[in-house]
Curated annotation (Swiss-Prot):
InterPro entries attached to this UniProt entry: Ribosomal_bL20 (IPR005813), RIBOSOMAL_L20_CS (IPR049946), Ribosomal_protein_bL20_C (IPR035566)
Tagged with keyword Ribosomal protein: yes
Purpose: Binds directly to 23S ribosomal RNA and is necessary for the in vitro assembly process of the 50S ribosomal subunit. It is not involved in the protein synthesizing functions of that subunit.
The organism of origin for this protein: Thermotoga sp. (strain RQ2)
The protein's name in its UniProt record: Large ribosomal subunit protein bL20
GO cellular component term, pick one: ribosome
Keywords: Ribonucleoprotein, Ribosomal protein, RNA-binding, rRNA-binding
Phylogenetic lineage: Bacteria, Thermotogati, Thermotogota, Thermotogae, Thermotogales
């Protein structure tokens, strides 16, 4: 018996065209191009989720470095001093303290300086 694929094929094409709504020009109207762009967009979103983690860590380190230099320490010295002192605080929390609670951040800098001195 012959299998007619019209219903399934139309459903499949419709899925990609619906997902490609908002793309410019032929990318939202032609099935082949819409499918290619849909696959590419999924790849970009996958890569973007990985890059987001890198970018956030860079931002935290930059913020910590600026705040630490205002207190007379480099970022690397601060992290090393905190490790020597046995303080386990992650970069995200340090960054939050540097921005929102400078007094608490100064306490961590003081702890790091004491650990480096001894």
């Amino acid at each position: 018996m012959r299998v007619k694929r019209a219903v399934h094929a139309k459903k499949k094409r419709k899925k990609y065209l619906k997902a490609a709504k908002g793309y410019r020009g032929a990318l939202s109207r032609r099935y082949k191009l819409a499918k290619q762009m849909y696959v590419r967009s999924k790849w970009y979103s996958y890569v973007g989720r990985k890059q987001k983690k890198r970018d956030m860590r860079k931002l935290w380190i930059t913020r910590i470095n600026i705040a630490a230099r205002n207190e007379g320490l480099k970022y690397s010295e601060l992290i090393h001093g905190l490790k020597l002192a046995g303080v386990s605080i992650n970069r995200k929390m340090l960054s939050e303290l540097a921005v929102n609670d400078p007094e608490a951040f100064k306490e961590y800098v003081k702890i790091a300086k004491e650990a480096l001195a001894s």
